[in-house]
């Protein structure tokens, strides 16, 4: 076995170890969340007038596992980000390592901010609008599975989408992206974000519109922040070359 193959095996072993640590953290958070899942459930349905219905015993377990899984994913993000950083850190320069480490806490904060926006802002508005449509015409009954799927579909994607500005800033700082590339890709980006907004919302124009606007705003914020970071990086490179 030559030196190159030994080096590759070492990298794969390190990657395997980082993945195992991340998965172990996820399952630990999953078990912890499941122990408190009834309290989480009660908190999430605190504003409902009645109880949610279930169509079978297995649906109860499915709902509890879904709620526990979402909590575990949220709690595992800092662990996954840190393990990824530890894996790529040896290949980075001292400046790149410093920049990368600075962005990890921000990823978790923006993920929570995105979920909070989806849950506290979008979800009540869309739910109220849709239930208002049935007022006086239909007997509304929510099943636990449908209710929480609807909640997750509106909230969880925003957890990841809210990270877009920070990811763009990070890639701009490393020289992979710049505001000019983002501006050229604006039409394509708008199209993709509109498709995402349609996929994660119920099939009505109001819901699509309410989700579409924040996504487009996030993209424009990303372009603006990219321009700020790009100018700062250019000034630093000019000063270093002088």
From Swiss-Prot:
Tell me any Pfam family this protein matches: TatC
Keyword Nucleotidyltransferase appears in the UniProt entry: no
Expression induction or repression: Expressed under conditions of phosphate starvation.
Q: Could you give one GO CC term from the UniProt record?
A: TAT protein transport complex
Has the keyword Ligase been applied to this entry? no
Q: What does the UniProt entry report for the null mutant?
A: Depletion of TatCd results in a drastic reduction of TatAd.
Region ranges (Interaction with TatAd): 128-149, 171-187
Q: Where in the cell is it found?
A: Cell membrane
Keyword annotations: Cell membrane, Membrane, Protein transport, Translocation, Transmembrane, Transmembrane helix, Transport
Q: What membrane topology is given?
A: Multi-pass membrane protein
Q: Which GO terms describe its biological process?
A: intracellular protein transmembrane transport; protein transport by the Tat complex
Any one Gene Ontology MF annotation carried by this entry is: proton motive force dependent protein transmembrane transporter activity
Q: Which PANTHER family match?
A: SEC-INDEPENDENT PROTEIN TRANSLOCASE PROTEIN TATC (PTHR30371), SEC-INDEPENDENT PROTEIN TRANSLOCASE PROTEIN TATCD (PTHR30371:SF4)
* Family in the record: Belongs to the TatC family.
Q: What else is known?
A: B.subtilis possesses two minimal, substrate-specific, Tat translocases: TatAd-TatCd and TatAy-TatCy, each one composed of a TatA and a TatC protein. TatA is bifunctional and performs the function of both the TatA and TatB proteins of Gram-negative organisms.
Summary of subunit composition and partner proteins:
Forms a complex with TatAd. Two types of complexes exist: one composed of TatAd and TatCd, and another composed only of TatAd.
Query: Which HAMAP family does the protein's record reference?
Result: TatC
* Record-given protein name: Sec-independent protein translocase protein TatCd
Q: Which organism is it from?
A: Bacillus subtilis (strain 168)
